[in-house]
């Protein structure tokens, strides 16, 4: 599948029409369905064809609203699309009324001329990092069919990896864009949360929910982010020579899978040889996150506030594993919640201070390679243990109110591994600029070339 820039060029030079791009997209989707794929909860072929034909007609008259005009994209089934039911990957909302308007991010994509091919499958209510879904099926990792694609934006990543779309719109509360991007060897960007409006999106945690893209390149993510945020950032590549990059052994480096550790350390070595300064630093505050956020945290309390009425009416319709995590929030007192918010405020301050001397903080996106489906599908203990480990690293960035970009850093023949380039709130432009240069370096090495 082409990148956004390549698709734009093909459309601009009339080598392809929007309808031809869509036909290729739908053919790839049909092939996935024939194999039993569970990438989507809904595919609206008629609306997609109407949008593609309209884009071609507008282009013929000289009207091209953006680089996304006429380009197929997918939308996570957490966003309202006018006239459609938003299920959030759950049976609970199947009979809800259709949305009367687009979610804010979807409306911006529509105004930009994007062609929506379907609503992508996900972990129920976005409350898992693994991507399992007992209601709509579990999207499989495209490169490794017996392994998980990651979650919660599982279908979003698969839709890009299989070439259905050039980019996908997802959400990230504790890694839900970056985990599936890393597991599917893609690029994923979690922006500073407040940059993209959340109106019309089913919430998980109002403190941490972020809207971000999954795509094949940093450039694709920049283009998507510029549209959904309404902000055109200056993301010109920054030279690697002279960059000051931080790496810590605290918490996020604990118990790494050997493949992850090897790929991460190899990437660090490449950056050093390219002229970047990599400094090892202590980050003891991360251990407070380990004690507070993943176990009970703000997310569970805020999720329970939204779900409690649904649980009271229809608890049996929930995935039992999601319900168990939701009920953690049921027992939180007001005092507990205030303490959690205060802990978060301290961590935001402390992390900003710790990272102030660096251009970016680097860590493995996920501590493990994509788990085998059979490992967690029918074993609750394995599910919760693996889910916690998968969420561990990326959730730190949400807790510190930061932004992060994940890039593939494995080599051909290795299981997928992601390298995260992280920064504090509103460092988005800098992180994307650095990401452009790191991406070139890593791609040079992907086939075993020496940097």
Question: Regions from the language model: what does each represent?
Answer:
Residues 6-12, 57, 308-399, 450:
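Serine-dependent amide/ester hydrolase catalytic core
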Residues 31, 68-210, 250, 363-383:
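Short glycine/serine-rich loop/turn segments
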Residues 68-91, 242-244, 297-349, 364, ...:
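Short helix-loop capping/hinge segments that flank enzyme active sites or metal/cofactor-binding pockets
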Residues 12, 31, 111, 161-254, ...:
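Structural helix-boundary/capping segments
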Residues 1-45, 49-50, 273-275, 446-451:
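An N-terminal boundary/leader segment
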């Amino acid at each position: 599948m082409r990148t956004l820039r390549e698709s734009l060029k093909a459309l601009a030079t009339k080598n392809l029409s929007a309808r031809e791009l869509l036909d290729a997209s739908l053919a790839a989707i049909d092939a996935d369905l024939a194999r039993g794929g569970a990438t989507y909860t809904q595919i609206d072929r008629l609306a997609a064809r109407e949008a593609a034909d309209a884009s071609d007609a507008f282009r013929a008259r000289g009207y091209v609203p953006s680089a996304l005009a006429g380009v197929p994209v997918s939308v996570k089934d957490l966003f309202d699309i006018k006239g459609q039911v938003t299920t959030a990957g759950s049976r609970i909302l199947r009979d809800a009324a259709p949305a009367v308007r687009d979610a804010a991010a979807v409306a911006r994509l529509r105004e930009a001329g994007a062609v929506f091919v379907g609503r992508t499958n996900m972990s129920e209510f976005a409350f898992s990092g693994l991507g399992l879904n007992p209601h709509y099926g579990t999207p499989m990792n495209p490169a490794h069919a017996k392994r998980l694609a990651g979650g919660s934006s599982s279908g979003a990543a698969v839709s890009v990896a299989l070439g259905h779309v050039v980019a996908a719109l997802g959400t990230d509360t504790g890694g839900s864009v970056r985990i599936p991007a890393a597991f599917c060897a893609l690029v994923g960007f979690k922006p500073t949360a407040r940059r993209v409006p959340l109106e019309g999106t089913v919430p998980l945690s109002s403190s941490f929910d972020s809207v971000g893209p999954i795509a094949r390149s940093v450039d694709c993510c920049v283009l998507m982010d510029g549209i959904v945020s309404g902000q055109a950032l200056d993301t010109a590549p920054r030279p690697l020579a002279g960059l000051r990059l931080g790496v810590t052994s605290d918490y996020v480096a604990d118990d790494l899978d050997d493949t992850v550790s090897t790929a991460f350390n190899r990437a660090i070595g490449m950056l050093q040889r390219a002229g970047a300064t990599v400094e090892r630093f202590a980050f003891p505050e991360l251990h407070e996150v380990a004690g507070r956020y993943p176990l009970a945290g703000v997310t569970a309390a805020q999720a329970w506030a939204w779900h409690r009425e649904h649980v009271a009416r229809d608890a049996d319709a929930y995935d039992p594993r999601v319900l168990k995590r939701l009920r953690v929030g049921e027992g939180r007192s007001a005092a507990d919640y205030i303490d959690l918010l205060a802990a978060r405020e301290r961590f935001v301050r402390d992390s900003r201070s710790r990272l102030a001397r660096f251009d970016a903080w680097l860590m493995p996106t996920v501590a493990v390679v994509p788990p085998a489906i059979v490992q967690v599908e029918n074993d609750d203990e394995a599910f919760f243990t693996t889910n916690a480990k998968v969420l561990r690293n990326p959730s730190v960035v949400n807790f510190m109110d930061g932004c992060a970009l994940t890039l593939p850093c494995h080599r051909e023949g290795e299981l997928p591994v992601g390298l995260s380039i992280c920064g504090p709130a509103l460092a988005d432009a800098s992180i994307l600029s650095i990401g452009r240069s790191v991406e070139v370096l890593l791609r040079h090495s992907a086939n075993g070339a020496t940097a």
